[in-house]
């Protein structure tokens, strides 16, 4: 019987580390729920699990498409559900672990979101992208105010997708969405910590990314794919791109990454806190693994 354990929360709360420890103890595999880790070559800036970590525990839904391709929530849902239902996935009787901070990815699985199956239209996207994010968001507010309330004004990818769905189908994306929860048992675990401690975690991780070669990664990606690649305008990459262009210093780029990541984490916390099914744990608890282990055991005992 399929059983799913979700580990979610804001960025830099230690989800991947907890998931690795749980997976090794349970004999489970990990399904990533991160909207940027699906792309190959975007490694350091997305905090993608290392090859060593992936050798310890099998990871899925990482490196599944090229940076020039588009992974929609519908694409992710389809691939994730196929894996969850696959008799070939080596997890039974252990539960699957769904791990990440992309709320829509997790919601698409846990709540069985009904998502419009609208293929990306490169020509339409190109026309829309030329208008700039500010104008695009204003357009979204006009054609789909419900979606605009759920999408941040700086979220280029989701704004673009919502407009794309509207202009192709003539129906707002918010009207095409519904929910059909799966019939298998699900345990949802959330990690959180004090805001100031989270800020320190974010700063430490940003410094580690820079030490691991983030600048070289961004430079390589800019040369290979061009400066206009949408992924290079996302968190951690856009700031280094500004540095490489000579617009800001490396220290300024670092501080911007920290600031923007803290802002992003705040939005993530707000998103996940809206779901009462999530059982929360302190990411800084030295006994975190054992604290989490108790509800995991209860979940497995009660779902057999």
Model-derived regions: residue spans:
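Phosphate/pyrophosphate-binding catalytic cores of soluble transferases and nucleic-acid-acting enzymes
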Residues: 1-304
